[in-house]
Amino acid sequence: MVSPIVLAALCGMILLALACVRRIPRGQVYTLRGRDGRIRTLGEGLHVVLPLLERVAHKIDLAGATVAVNDLRRGERDYRAVVYFQVVDPRQADVVIDDVEGLLRVTTRRLFDYAVLPDDTDARRRWLKQSLNDELRERGLLVARIDLAAAA
């Protein structure tokens, strides 16, 4: 006969072992933050995590997302933009991922107010995309496309 204490300890060890296993879905990356502050990234698949020493800081989707930027003004005209972006370096993006939409809106508005913005719509779109990528590349983000249109 097995002692209830041994049985409880065995059940506790099994539950702890199950809590250590994480399945990361395809197209996502988890960033883990240790108690010492170091960051570890986990790609798709099964991984072992130390639940008391590490916690999931962010679940980052690598598929891409969009951000609408309204109230862009150029001269007498109002514009609106849709910025299509994706995370290319989760370790660098971990720092800004909580407010990535705000970062993209503020940066797009600041660049749109730039004095030497091209007059042609396609050239303006290309310039804006290149300028956003120049600023956001070091933060692990890539702007894939920008839809820019005059506001109705």
Where are these regions (language model features)?
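Membrane-helix interface and helix-disruption motif detector
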Residues: M1-V2, L50
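Single-pass alpha-helical transmembrane signal-anchor segments
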Residues: V2-V21
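Juxtamembrane/interfacial segments flanking transmembrane helices
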Residues: V21-L32
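A generic structural motif
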Residues: R26, D36-G37, V88-P90
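Membrane-cytosol interface motif
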Residues: Y30-P51
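Amphipathic, interface-forming alpha-helical segments with heptad-repeat character
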Residues: A57-A152
